[in-house]
Structure formats: C-alpha cells, structure tokens
Amino acid sequence: MLLLLCNRSVVPRGIRRILRTAATVTSLRWNHTGPSASETLLEKNIRNIGILAHIDGGKTTTTERMLFYAGKTNVLGEVHHGNTVTDFLVQERERGITICSAAVSFDWRDHRVNLLDTPGHIDFTMEVEQSLAAVDGTVVILDGSAGVEAQTVTVWSQADRHRLPRLVFVNKMDKESADFEGCLEELEKKLGVVAVPLQMPVIKEGKLTGVVDVLSGAQVVWDKQNHGRTYKAIPLVDQQLVEAQDKLYQIIDVLSGMDDGLAQVIIESDSMDNVKPELVASAIRACTMKQQIVPVFLGSAYKNIGVQLLMDAVLKYLPAPNERNEIYNCFGSDFVGKISKVTHDKQRGPLSLVRVFRGTLKKGAKIITAKGTSETIQRIYAPWADEYREISSISAGNVGLCAGPKSTVTGDLVVANASVLRNALKKLSPTNDGVEEDDINELLASKLSFHTVVPDAVYFCSIEPPSSSYQAALDAALREIQREDPSLRVSYDETTMQTVLGGMGKLHLEIIKSRILSEYKIDVDLGPLQIAYKETLEEPARGSWTAEKEIAGSKQLVRMEVTVHAKRKDERFLLDSSPEAQENLRMIRPRQMSYVRKGSLAALERGPKLGGQLMDVAVTLHQLTIGKGTADTFIMAATAQCVRHVLSSAKCRLMEPIMLLEMVMPAEHLNPILADLGKRRCEILDVTARGQQHKVLRANAPLAELEDYSSEVRCISSGTASVSMEPNGYALLSEMDEASAIRRAHGLE
C-alpha cells in the first residue's frame, strides 16, 4: 500500500502525522461482502438514512451508484434510461422524476445501510415527510451549479422538524458552471448552518478529475474504465498540499469552538500540531450528531466520482439507531415501532413500512396501534424498491414491510400489547395513572410526537368514473391511494353530488389520475382545477344553539353558547375563564368536553364562503348544557352545528395561497420577466447574481396567477430560464379579487 509522505518544509509536524496516518489508501477493489440478511446486526452497525434534494439534484443517480458499488446491482441504473431500481412506477420512468419514496438496503464495510430515496418535486413533499419518520440521518444533495434551491430549503426545514443530523453532497461538480465555494456560502446564508467542507475539487482543464480528501491529505481519483469501482489516493504536493493544510487548520479551528476535548488538547499543547487524527474525526461526528455542523462532500454521481467516500462518511458521521430516539427507552425491551408508509401490492395486499425502535417484530406477532386497534403480522419482507424478499423478523433499528395490518396509517405507533402502552405512558407521565382509553392516543402523541404533518391541499378538482358501474371500484381505489398518500384529500360535495380531490399541485393530481388508470384500470375524468382558498374572520361573532332530538327512545339534548374570533395563541378551542362560565363548565365531564372540542375543530374546517378551512380562527365556549343520556357523537355533531351557525352570520374573507418563486435566468432576460411578474400581483423579494452571466430572482406570487407559468417563462426566456415554486403561506384577497374568485369557483367566469 502507498503511504502518503508530506513535504516537511511546508507542513507542520502534527499535521504531517494526521495526513500520514490517514492517507494509506491506494488503488483497490472493495470487498462487497457484509452481514447476511439473516444475521442480527448490532444497532451500532446500522444506518437509516434518507436522500433529500431539489428536483433534478441527482438523488436517484446517487442512490443507484451506492447500490452498484455495494454490489447490490450489476448494471448502473440511469434515470434517462428508465432502468433505475428506486424509480419503479410507470409514471416515474416516463417522466424521469421520483414520485414515491423507495426503500432499499445494502451492506457497506460491515454495516447495513437502509436507504430511502425521496421525491424532489414540491407536489410530493408528503413522501419526504413520511420517509423522515423512519430515518436517523439524511444526505442532502445539491446541484453544484445551482446551489441551495427552493425545495432544498423545504426539505431542510422538514429535516429540522425531525431533528435529523445531515451531510451535504455537492453533486454535478463536473458541470462547467459548478461552484463549490458558492454552494458553501449559500448553505450558510440561506440555511443558517455551519458548513464544514471535508473535501476540495480537483479541476483540470475545466473538468472534475477527482477530489482532495482534506483529512487524509490525499487526492483521490477514480478509474473510468470500470465505472469508478476502483480508485486510488495520490500524495499531495506543492500548492495542493498547502491548501489542504489550510483547510485542515480551519476545520480544527471550527471544531475546537464546539468540542471541549479537542479544545483542551490545543490549549494544553498551545498548538494544533498535536491533534490526533482520531480526535478530529470524533469531533466531527460529535458536532454532526448535535447538529452544530454540516460536513460537506463533493463529486459527480453521474461521472462516478466521490460516491464511495460519501458512503464512508455515512458510516463515520451519521448516527446509529441506538444513538437516537432515547424517548422510546420507556418501552424497555418490548416491541415498539412506527408506521412510516403504507403501500398496496396486488398479490400481497396492503404493506406497512415499519421502523422498529425497540424490541423485535416477528412474523405471526399480534400487535396493537396506539388507537387500540389489534393487528396480526402475517408476513415480513425486506424492502427492495418494488421487490420483496420474505424474512422472519425485524430487529431494533431496522425497517421492514409487513403484510397483515388492515387499518394502520402513516404515523401510527405500534406496540406489543395494551399493557406495554400503559407502562410506557406511566414512565413518561407518572401523573396520568387515571387516563381514560379515549385520551391515551393524544397523550402518547404529545409525548412521542408520532402524528405526521400533512400539508394543506393547494388545488382541488372533481373526479368522475367513466360510468356509474365503476363508482364502487373508484371509491376503493381512492381509499387505497389516500392511505398511501395522506396529502391526497378525498371528499364528497353534496351540492354537486361529485367526489372531490384535493392535492398539492397540478402534477400531483395528474399522477393520481394516471395511477388510477394504470393500476386500477379505471379511465377517470378530472374536472377543472380550482384553487384551495382559505377563509378568516374580520371580526368576532357570538351566538347560541340548541339541538334536541329523540334517538331510539332516548332524548338527546345539547344547548351551548360560543364565540368565534381571531386566534390569539396556538389553541383553536378555548373555555371562557369568567367565574360565571367556569361554574357552568366545570360540571361537564372531561370526555364530553373532548367531543365538544372535536366538534368545534371539525366546524372550522369549512368556512361559509367557499367551504375553505378557517385560518387563525378559534372558538371560545361560554355555556354548555348536556342532557342526561346524550350520546358523545350527538354532542360532537351539535357543537359543529352551533359553530357553523355562528360562522354563517360572521363577516368572513377569503385568503389565497401564495407561492415562493425562485427563477434562474440569463441576465438579459431579467427585465422582461420582471415586467411579466408585475402583471401577476407579485412581490419581488430579491434579485442576486449567480456567476457572471445569470440572475436569481425570488418573488411571492398568488397561485391563481401562475397557471402554466413555467411555459410562459420558457417562452419569455427562449427556454433558458428555470422556475421552481413552493407554498409560502396565504394572503387576504381584495374585495374585487374575492368576488372574482367566488365567480370562478361557481363556474361563472
């Protein structure tokens, strides 16, 4: 093996030792053997990761290279050839984009890596949210020529919500316009992170030929003849060596401000020269785990450069399952897991992707959800995109697909039995010994945060089968697809007697239609797309309501008084705190009050103008009388009727969805695009330079003004500009625009 020797005249002794110790890699072919699928791996040897990026960032290509180098595939899958492992849907291969997240597993250096490849398009952001519930860390991929893009910010925020450590891989560094330093600046400015580059690009004659591994002080180059399977480390000399030394000093300087052990060594020796290489690596890992830094790597997955070093970094710097999720320790060695996704297979039926946090899930096991539903695990499969290999169990820290559960949905907590749930809850909240069954799910959700964040629909449209004989089959298909994709909203409009779909965008709904045809053989028609407006109150309104009815010989009575008003805090249901109100309300049982709350929140889902969800609106309950023997469901229905009655007399306004546009264009097309945006009620946020010839424009734009906007931009810029968009809140419509929106919704415009 080649031992890297350093130029003594330019490199201090301590740094020489770090470089000399680490850079002992030469040309070699990795042995792809690892733990067999039947072995029970130690949790410390497992990594559960998600691959995140803006659309066309190179997620799927990077994933395919990982599978190839790990020996799981014999041929390099290419998105443009439609032969990738993880893009298996017909629609994915036709369009060249990822629509559904796909799970694959491979072995690398005696570790098991469970990887989820996720979509990059904003319309399928729910797939990203589902995937993040099953992983312990992420790799965020940037296009080296585009930097931090709109959807990069979105997926980064999602990873922040899940408190996931992450690495960044700056991909497509083979492009002439790639700018590694620019990407580092954008990571820090747009995402507010401390980006620590552990590599530098090697550019010769304008082409990426390899990378400099700063920690080892080696230039690494890949063999083009065998698709980059083998690579070698070359000693650094002259200017490259000096630059690597400077970068290493910068890394140690950053880490010493965060890692006490590293800082102590430097203080005691009054120098960075005595820092041992293993201490540097340990500090990088510790700071990454605490999300204090983001290690940055580079390469070109398509050109087979840098991927193996990224795979090594996943093992070195991202956490093992037993280094996270400490809250699940309350379950001890009993089985507990989470459903992160549900899919449907024609032969196997519904399959639930389960992440096991503690214990072991075995074939034939009886489990329950936190909602109290009992399920049986009939079969267990190791995930491999759309192919499955049956296994006998899933150990702690791993993921697997389970056949058998009929009612599980994304976000469900699943455990061995009811007593396990009870014991865990007691450990988490010792004061909750007397909790009722109806409340256990909410208590566990508040402690374990297992509710999935489902984004609001942006568009909706009607859906019709080719004939009434297909209606039952269509309803069943929509139930299955909605179980897979919680961001798809399905409702029934009693006025038009039509089924209505709500989705994240035009593409989302087009894919739903295509899937119904290809998977269920139903050629449905979609109605015109409508904007999913929301509603809000201009001023509070107060009213009372009495609901009285006899059901099966039992008299049902609910009498209440409520106010609907602007939400002051996060809570959407409040109790009047006046002494008079409190004297009345404290007579109501907690279980009954929970149904009053549910009824109030249900009523806030449909406003009086266009049936849009009410934003920033709360309900305050003043007085409540419940007749003896009144059913809980009647209480909930009566409350919803009361709130709707009060809303009908309140002054409401429409709010329209706003999109954040990010456009990249040659500088000469900036003014025509600005002029066009001015006609669309847009708010220009900023215009920045990217390189010498391009501009990046960010603007807030009403969704109603953006129909086929991508096509318009291509026409204005002669096909040279790109545009991406993501939801960015809601804004109040003017009275004139509101009237126009109502006319359009009723088909009058």
Swiss-Prot record:
CDD domains according to UniProt: EFG_III, EFG_mtEFG_C
Organism domain of life: Eukaryota
UniProt xrefs under SUPFAM superfamilies: EF-G C-terminal domain-like (SSF54980), P-loop containing nucleoside triphosphate hydrolases (SSF52540), Ribosomal protein S5 domain 2-like (SSF54211), Translation proteins (SSF50447)
Name used for this protein in its record: Ribosome-releasing factor 2, mitochondrial
General function of this protein: Mitochondrial GTPase that mediates the disassembly of ribosomes from messenger RNA at the termination of mitochondrial protein biosynthesis. Not involved in the GTP-dependent ribosomal translocation step during translation elongation.
tr-type G domain span: 44-322
Keywords (A to Z) from UniProt: GTP-binding, Mitochondrion, Nucleotide-binding, Protein biosynthesis, Transit peptide
Gene Ontology molecular function: GTP binding; GTPase activity
One of the Pfam families matching this protein, by short name: GTP_EFTU
Disulfide bonds: none
GO cellular component, one term: mitochondrion
UniProt cross-references to InterPro entries, sorted A to Z: EF-G-like_DII, EFG2, EFG_II, EFG_III, EFG_III/V, EFG_V, EFG_V-like, G_TR_CS
Primary localization class, coarse: mitochondrion
Binding site for GTP: 53-60, 117-121, 171-174
